[in-house]
């Protein structure tokens, strides 16, 4: 039986931070150009994994699907915390 009192380490194969940022910026711009609330759409995608939240325009859907959602969330949380602790 496993001990659930121990902290598990989450590890993943890192993508270059700039690649994740470039994709998120492209997705954001594309959603904004289409008149969507970009933050709501990205959150919807991250929570559900449903690519229908992201348009195909500018290859936004293809790009974001090539990055694991955990990697995107890690980048967003990391960036937010670094900005808050400057």
From Swiss-Prot:
Say which family it is in.
Belongs to the UPF0297 family.
Q: Which HAMAP family match?
A: UPF0297
Q: Which cysteines are joined by disulfide bonds?
A: none
| PANTHER family found in the cross-reference section | UPF0297 PROTEIN YRZL
Q: What is this protein called?
A: UPF0297 protein SAOUHSC_01721
Read off the InterPro entries from this record. Answer: IreB
Quote the Pfam families the UniProt record gives. Answer: IreB
């Amino acid at each position: 039986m496993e001990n659930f009192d121990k902290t598990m380490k989450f590890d993943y194969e890192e993508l270059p931070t700039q690649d994740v940022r470039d994709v998120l910026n492209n997705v954001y711009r594309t959603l904004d150009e289409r008149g969507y609330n970009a933050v709501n759409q990205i959150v919807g995608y991250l929570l559900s994994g449903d690519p229908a939240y992201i348009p195909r325009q500018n290859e936004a859907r293809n790009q974001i699907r090539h990055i694991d959602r955990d990697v995107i969330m890690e980048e967003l949380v990391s960036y937010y915390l670094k900005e808050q602790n400057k």
